[in-house]
């Protein structure tokens, strides 16, 4: 048993099936690694392109007038506090870089203005807390007792 003389294949390497000049392998259907990767990517992108075109063809119909529309299904867009770029504080204009703090009102602030009492925050913390408590603890009412 000679371990050194035993090899996987004694056949000479075959050139790439696309003719790019590199050697192909039987595992990659006779293609080199670069050509194989390109064919796999093109095959993978073709179905996704068809799926995207199918998504764009769908038409959204408005709800009939007699049917009530659930307002909670589509949340309103968050109000902007004037922060057009995330790299500047909305209150003082200082460059915040990577340390910007995003408030619940949607603006980005520096370390000095990150708290709601330090900037003119339009977010209703009290109302949000009230809603969270109402959602977490629904009102439990007992059945009415019939009087005799």
UniProtKB/Swiss-Prot annotation:
Zn finger residue spans: AN1-type: 83-129
Residues that bind Zn(2+) 2: 89, 92, 110, 113
Region of interest (Disordered), residue spans: 64-86
Residues engaged in binding Zn(2+) 1: 16, 20, 32, 35
Keyword match Ion transport: no
InterPro entries xrefs: AN1-like_Znf, AN1_A20_ZnFinger, Znf_A20, Znf_AN1
UniProt-recorded Gene Ontology molecular function terms: DNA binding; zinc ion binding
Keywords from the named record: Metal-binding, Stress response, Zinc, Zinc-finger
Zinc fingers, A20-type class: 10-44
Stimuli inducing this protein: By dehydration and salt stress.
Domain of life: Eukaryota
Pfam families per UniProt: zf-A20 (PF01754), zf-AN1 (PF01428)
Binding-site residues for Zn(2+) 3, renumbered to this chain: 103, 105, 119, 121
Functional note: May be involved in environmental stress response.
Protein name (record): Zinc finger A20 and AN1 domain-containing stress-associated protein 2
Organism of origin: Oryza sativa subsp. japonica
Name of encoding gene: SAP2
């Amino acid at each position: 048993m000679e371990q050194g003389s035993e090899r996987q294949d004694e056949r000479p390497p075959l050139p790439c099936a696309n003719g790019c000049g590199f050697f192909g392998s039987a595992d990659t259907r006779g293609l080199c690694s670069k050509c194989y990767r390109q064919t796999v990517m093109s095959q993978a992108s073709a179905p996704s392109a068809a799926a995207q075109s199918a998504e764009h063809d769908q038409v959204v119909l408005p709800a009939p007038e007699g049917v009530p529309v659930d307002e909670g299904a589509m949340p309103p867009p968050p109000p902007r506090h004037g922060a057009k770029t995330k790299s500047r504080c909305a209150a003082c204009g200082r460059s915040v870089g990577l340390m910007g703090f995003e408030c619940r009102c949607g603006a980005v602030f520096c370390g000095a203005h990150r708290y709601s009492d330090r900037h003119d925050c339009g977010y209703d913390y009290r109302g949000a807390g009230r809603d969270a408590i109402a959602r977490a603890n629904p009102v439990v009412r007992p059945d009415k007792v019939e009087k005799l």
